Amino acid sequence: MSYAQKIVIHSKSGATNALEALVEQFISDGVRFVAVAGKDCALMEDIIDEIVVGDGSDNTRFILTSSHPGESLEEVMQFARIITEGTGEPQLIEL
């Protein structure tokens, strides 16, 4: 399964060990934007950024990220729809 260019993660349980493999798949699939809403969303955004940047030696690894504490899932989906990074409808992933 390939992921869309825009992703919204709805975190129901907070940061998870599965995040690293998921982000690596995002990079492989050409995901351009990831927004995180829900529990620990700011922490999850930081973790995603760390995974993407890695040791900093590969400047082709890039995903724009945002976190949305206190915002509804619909607000975050709307934000993802209008952001110019990436094309198409955002894909919702619940963790």
Which residues does each predicted region cover?
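ATP-dependent carboxylate-amine ligase
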Residues: 1-95
